[in-house]
Regions:
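Membrane-embedded and interfacial regions of multi-pass energy-transducing membrane proteins
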Residues: 1-204
Length: 204
């Protein structure tokens, strides 16, 4: 991930400013940043789990009985594991999605025979999705008994992520509007991706 980010920042061709990068490259770079920041958290969670299983620690074990006897070491919480897991688990959704959206941006613009509508807004939405993906993980955990105020914060941040997502969807539609469209297989897949993206956003 670091290799990709450094390559994009330092090894662009002459005259290629950051504001002229293809949207595919923006999407790949943000995806790399998500991977660099989120996977170490999961690795830490797994290391703590291995310590619980093999070394007698209690990071994830609360007051628990095994074989009729109380554990000597308690005080942890299985909810901690969920927090650590979903801190990767939600950015991972965008690790999967953003590269596909980046490629679709180029495919749609090429086959509509128009420049992508709202390039800077599209870059901003990619960056916004990347940032917001790190502060919405709690929406996977509403039934765990978390603090209701904290739950409402996660509801709010989850609603916020609809804004950059909608910007991308409407910009794709506007790019298609009155374009000289070629319905190539790549174009059909890309339009299908936008449709699925909108449907998935509405239904969760």
């Amino acid at each position: 991930g670091l290799n990709y980010v450094v390559t994009v920042i330092n090894l662009r061709t002459k005259g290629m400013s950051m504001t002229r990068l293809p949207l595919t490259i923006w999407a790949f770079m943000v995806t790399a940043i998500l991977g660099v920041l989120s996977f170490p958290v999961l690795v830490s969670a797994v290391v703590l789990l291995l310590m619980d299983r093999t070394m007698g620690t209690a990071f994830y074990l609360s007051d628990i009985f095994i074989g009729g006897e109380a554990l000597d070491v308690t005080g942890g919480s299985p909810i901690l594991y969920q927090h650590l897991f979903w801190f990767l688990g939600h950015p991972e959704v965008y690790i999967v999605l953003l590269p596909a959206l980046g490629i679709s941006s180029e495919v749609i613009a090429t086959n509509a025979r128009k420049p992508i509508f709202g390039y800077k807004a599209m870059v901003g939405s990619i960056l916004g999705i990347g940032f917001l993906s790190f502060i919405v993980w709690g929406h996977h955990m509403f039934v765990t008994g978390m603090n209701p105020f904290l739950g409402s914060v996660f509801v709010f941040t989850t609603l916020l992520i609809a804004i950059p997502s909608a910007v991308k969807a409407f910009n794709y539609i506007t790019t298609l509007w009155q374009g000289n469209i070629r319905f190539t297989p790549a174009m059909l897949f890309s339009v299908g991706l936008v449709s699925t993206f909108v449907t998935g956003g509405l239904t969760g």
